[in-house]
């Protein structure tokens, strides 16, 4: 978990924000990491679980820059007048991330997101709804490989090809090819067992098999 959290934190810090919204903060590990390097950073932690937030509040109650809200996504979050701001949604399923950033209350145009599932469906949504994937990386933490994306809202639509939705427009040039192929193999195992695959499922299987075979024969 340390490597995953530190990678998310480093991506957040690369934008030099003054305000961070950690949506679905769970145990507020990200807040703990961020305030070690920037005591002046304002951080809003939100979670659907009141009990989780109460436990986190006890750890940070003496820091006036750290705030806590029980909220399902943006439903109960205040828009603080501090800029630049960035949102983080990490450790939730891809469909839940889609739900959150689609909420009409959403006031954030840049996020670091780390989906636990439905990565391809998430990329497809981003492409169809004017969200640009400006960065994407993989982090291997113990036996798990986590995709982490930085996304920004565009003023004009920008659609990815099906192949780039499947493979990732930034991941195709990922330097650690061994880690990348392990990631693609994990994705392939999600789609292969389906009894009634859709046309998109078949395209995903074909595309992943093709790039994995190409790597193994090189």
Curated annotation (Swiss-Prot):
GO terms for biological process: methylation; tRNA processing. It comes from Mycoplasma genitalium (strain ATCC 33530 / DSM 19775 / NCTC 10195 / G37) (Mycoplasmoides genitalium). One of its GO terms (molecular function) is tRNA (adenine(22)-N1)-methyltransferase activity. This is Putative tRNA methyltransferase MG248. It is an enzyme of class 2 (transferase). The keyword Cytoplasm applies. The keyword S-adenosyl-L-methionine applies. Keywords: Cytoplasm, Methyltransferase, S-adenosyl-L-methionine, Transferase, tRNA processing. It is found in: Cytoplasm. Its EC number is 2.1.1.-. Transmembrane segments: none annotated. GO terms for cellular component: cytoplasm. Belongs to the TrmK family. Its main location: cytoplasm.
């Amino acid at each position: 978990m340390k490597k995953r959290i530190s990678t998310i934190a480093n991506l957040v810090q690369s934008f030099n924000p003054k305000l961070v919204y950690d949506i679905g903060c769970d145990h507020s590990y990200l807040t703990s990491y961020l305030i070690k390097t920037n005591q002046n950073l304002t951080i809003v932690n939100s979670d659907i679980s009141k009990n989780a937030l109460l436990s986190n509040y006890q750890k940070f109650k003496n820091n006036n820059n750290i705030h806590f809200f029980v909220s399902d996504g943006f439903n109960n979050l205040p828009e603080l007048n501090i800029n630049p701001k960035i949102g983080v949604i990490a450790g939730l399923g891809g469909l839940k991330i889609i739900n959150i950033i689609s909420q009409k209350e959403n006031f954030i145009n840049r996020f670091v997101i780390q989906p636990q599932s439905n990565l391809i469906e998430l990329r497809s949504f981003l492409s169809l709804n004017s969200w640009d994937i400006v960065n994407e990386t993989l982090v291997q933490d113990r036996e798990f490989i986590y995709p982490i994306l930085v996304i920004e809202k565009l003023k004009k639509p920008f659609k990815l090809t099906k192949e780039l939705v499947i493979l990732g427009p930034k991941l195709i040039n990922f330097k650690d090819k061994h880690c990348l192929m392990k990631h693609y193999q994990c994705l392939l195992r999600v789609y292969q067992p389906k009894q009634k695959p859709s046309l998109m499922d078949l395209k995903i299987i074909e595309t992943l098999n093709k790039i994995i075979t190409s790597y193994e024969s090189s």
